[in-house]
Amino acid sequence: LGVPADHISVYPGSGTPLDLVTVAFTSPKGSLVTADPTYEQAWRTSQRVGAKLIKVPQRKDFSHDVEAMCAADPNAGMIYICNPNNPTGGINLRKDIEYAAKNKPAGSILVVDEAYIHFSDNAVSAADLCASGESVVVLRTFSKLYGMAGLRLGYAVGSPANLAKMNGGSGRSQGVVAMTTIGAGIASLTDEKLVPSRRAMIKKGRTETITWLEKQGYACTISEANCFMVDVKRPGRQFQADMATHGVNIGRTWAGFENWPRISVGTEAEMKRFRDAFTAVMAGQLGAITPQTRQRAALELPGSQLQRASFVDEQAYRMPLHTSC
């Protein structure tokens, strides 16, 4: 990462530091500025502390419009960039992140959420900016590509002063991380083949699936993550329910993008099943699975199979745990 050890604070996942930094830097006098759509956790947290929420539409290439975000409110307390973005998978290049760091409102902090960065070929980490005098905090997690969502491991990168403010003035991070979780994280970091192999698998599945959808006439977001959005030309929630009748669970929709559900990318076999179900649903053919039969089937499955019964959405939860830990 290129930062001193005192610039890193470990947490049980990256959701905890996202809450902490939002509480620390937004208020009724300091707004939260984000892209739209994006990951909503900071939206909810900022509203709990009474901060104004400003959503800035993304560019046509589904990247964050950093110029508009920096100009959105001179009293902004925090600018949040999810890079790559959840749910679109769009990325911002390094020049955009540097622009935001230099041009954000005085007194504000730039938070770059890099939960999905390991899936990207072109997104560059902003972690080094945290040690260069910029008011930047970077968030990372082991819940996505590393497949450790259940173990809960993440960290924040920032100046000691910013980390202390996040942690309530304390030099200690908030939350408890188990030693077994730390061991799993270390094992994953020492496996040099882990990131490139999983990135390649997801990229192949993502490219093939998006190409297939676009050939059928369905627009998709430009993605470098393990997810993307697709315009199904109908209410996304109903489409989600129809796909579930074939045993395929897809992601949710966002306000203003009601016809664009989020799709997570899985293995080759899983994405084939997604395509088969998609074809059937678009032809008006529902499957035999109902909420009742799904519940009965789930009760009969061992835990590992139960996770895979809901296999297309929440890709991170299905990645195999690193076995050398």
List the predicted regions and their residue ranges.
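PLP-dependent aminotransferase class I/II
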Residues: S135-E214, Y218-T221
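Short beta-strands and strand-loop turn motifs
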Residues: K55-P57, M78-P84, L110-E114, T221-S223
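Active-site pre-lysine segment of PLP-dependent enzymes
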Residues: Q47, H64-N75, P87-L110, E114-L145
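Conserved PLP-binding catalytic core of the aspartate aminotransferase-like
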Residues: I202-K203, W212-H246, P261, V265, ...
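Phosphate-binding glycine-rich loop
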Residues: L1-S31
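PLP-dependent aminotransferase-like
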Residues: H7, A24-I81
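PLP-dependent enzyme catalytic core of the Aspartate aminotransferase-like
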Residues: A241-C325
